[in-house]
Amino acid sequence: MARKTPIERYRNIGISAHIDAGKTTTTERILFYTGVNHKIGEVHDGAATMDWMEQEQERGITITSAATTAFWKGMAGDRAEHRINIIDTPGHVDFTIEVERSMRVLDGACMVYCAVGGVQPQSETVWRQANKYKVPRLAFINKMDRTGANFFKVYDQLKLRLKANPVPVVVPIGAEENFTGVVDLLKMKAIIWDEASQGTKFSYEEIPAELVDSCNEWREKMVEAAAESSEDLMNKYLEEGELTEAEIVKGLRDRTIACEIQPMLCGTAFKNKGVQRMLDAVLDFLPSPIDIPPVTGELENGEKGERRAADDEKFSALAFKIMTDPFVGQLIFFRVYSGVVNSGDTVLNATKDKKERLGRILQMHANQREEIKEVRAGDIAAAVGLKDATTGDTLCDPQSPIVLERMIFPEPVISQAVEPKTKPDQEKMGLALNRLAQEDPSFRVQTDEESGQTIISGMGELHLEILVDRMKREFGVEATVGKPQVAYRETIRGKAEDVDGKFVKQSGGRGQYGHAVITLEPNEQGKGYEFLDEIKGGVIPREYIPAVDKGIQETLKAGVLAGFPVVDVKVHLTFGSYHDVDSNENAFRMAGSMAFKEAMRKAQPVILEPMMAVEVETPEDYMGNVMGDLSGRRGIVQGMDDMVGGGKIVRAEVPLSEMFGYSTSLRSLTQGRATYTMEFKHYSEAPRNVSEAIINAKSK
């Protein structure tokens, strides 16, 4: 079967935004204009096509990134047909893992910002993730029809807060209820959309007289940005003072793909204006799979290899999401980087070194699916029948193995105990939790050895709440949930030198003998555990050194203060002794463990607590209440900003342990008029009185 769309006309894009910037509505409009669904679904009615889990429709927020394929021939219908694969990403802080996961498989992104709220805390997180994966992006300023909408204020915020380099390619005509359309700076014409056809028809008109001067200024900035893409264009621009439309598009495209600039557009998705022009910008400025460097990975011999985005290359793909579908069972979403694969083919899961048969291949449109026979380089599809694949696994040609770079997922910061309500729920709960953990790498399940309770851990209260909710809906498991527990850590502030650990058992017959001497010191924050073998002259035989390391690693799981995991320590194994007959691996494992416990007690152990970056948006009247309350929660206020249309944004760093139930108390403090967002920032040392309370609570 030949390729329907040439790969240079593919665009794999994500649509990413802060919660409530109107991202789902924007995606809906894209699907509508590209002719995929003919009745526009509104989030207000809980009917948006992309938000396909029941809870998302109830909460009106997007949780799972559904992947959808759409086709576009340009706003005027005069361009070659392009294939746009859209990955819808969630905007809520507790779901940054979903965003991270989709960034990994995208070629470009469209960042949606609210014309009133502008750049919000979550926008900064998403921007950092896009920087990390070097994703070219454009900015779409939505909700231009809302009171307080200000395109140019958001332009300033993008520069100031995100250190972005936005280049407007359209500017708005009017704002708020007077927003009527945009001026296209490439054509220097006003675009007015026809409301009766829900924006499917439009006309080019002359620029309103009062906007001509400012449009000329913005056009000049845009042309300069394009000219900077190459010496030839710059010389032409300096000589002639102008560039052709094709030259401007090429210059802006090259710089967008190099992540030097971000084309900026605007509109109101809800009122059917501007999304159509933004789709044209996706074709103009965002890369196809062949415009970006080939994907790299590790070959069988341990060397680096790469895979070109071409059909004649060996097949390679990355599984980036697992979902349970009520009709077909487990779906594995994957991005094909190279080659072709057919349904029924055997592929190698190179990450796990297992061969699997690819059953059916489905192309997804939100929650509707179309069965297809093959996928090619650049495609995004879902597979049924892969039993062992999980998020981040590489699928490839069994004759030509490669492991693409793995995704790294953050550690959970909050835990809760869950208990099934009835006996039959017990078995179902185990199954449900395992299935959910398989879908979501930032969600962990473990059993507390002391209490026997099942503990679930995740990225925030909402994250866990939604997973418990899904257990009930999808698996019919009723569970009661304990109070949230904070994921504390332990580390050291001092150094303990030459600490002995000796494990000796001599009681007739063969004994046990292991002796290790270590020096323990703090490691850099975030570096974790490091083990340095500094044994000289064979005082501990080579084969026993890994056992000492293993013994220490087992002890790291529970620190000496309150049994929390130990982080950021460096161990030097400096000396020891052994016995010809009685020494064995187990004895050295025990010696390592004993030495570490003793050294940790001597090295000023401390408890670390997770600190959260909190942003509260509040009317000015309640400012005092909000700041006082944050201080009472051991918060450190780090700054304040004015909001458009009055109100303040308070930025603070607050320990997670003090933030439980914050939404309820914020509501009563401000009569429900303030909102907040919170995300994990870093670990920091808990004050003495807090540490003592934690230790006492643990020892009860």
UniProtKB/Swiss-Prot annotation:
GO terms for cellular component: cytoplasm. Its main location: cytoplasm. The keyword Protein biosynthesis applies. It comes from the Bacteria. GO terms for biological process: ribosome disassembly. GO terms for molecular function: GTP binding; GTPase activity; guanosine tetraphosphate binding; translation elongation factor activity. GTP binds at residues 17-24, 88-92, 142-145. Residues 8-290 form the tr-type G domain. Keywords: Cytoplasm, Elongation factor, GTP-binding, Nucleotide-binding, Protein biosynthesis. Pfam families: EFG_C (PF00679), EFG_III (PF14492), EFG_IV (PF03764), GTP_EFTU (PF00009), GTP_EFTU_D2 (PF03144). InterPro entries: EFG_II, EFG_III, EFG_III/V, EFG_IV, EFG_V, EFG_V-like, EFTu-like_2, G_TR_CS. It is found in: Cytoplasm. Catalyzes the GTP-dependent ribosomal translocation step during translation elongation. During this step, the ribosome changes from the pre-translocational (PRE) to the post-translocational (POST) state as the newly formed A-site-bound peptidyl-tRNA and P-site-bound deacylated tRNA move to the P and E sites, respectively. Catalyzes the coordinated movement of the two tRNA molecules, the mRNA and conformational changes in the ribosome. Belongs to the TRAFAC class translation factor GTPase superfamily. Classic translation factor GTPase family. EF-G/EF-2 subfamily. This is Elongation factor G 2. It comes from Paraburkholderia xenovorans (strain LB400).
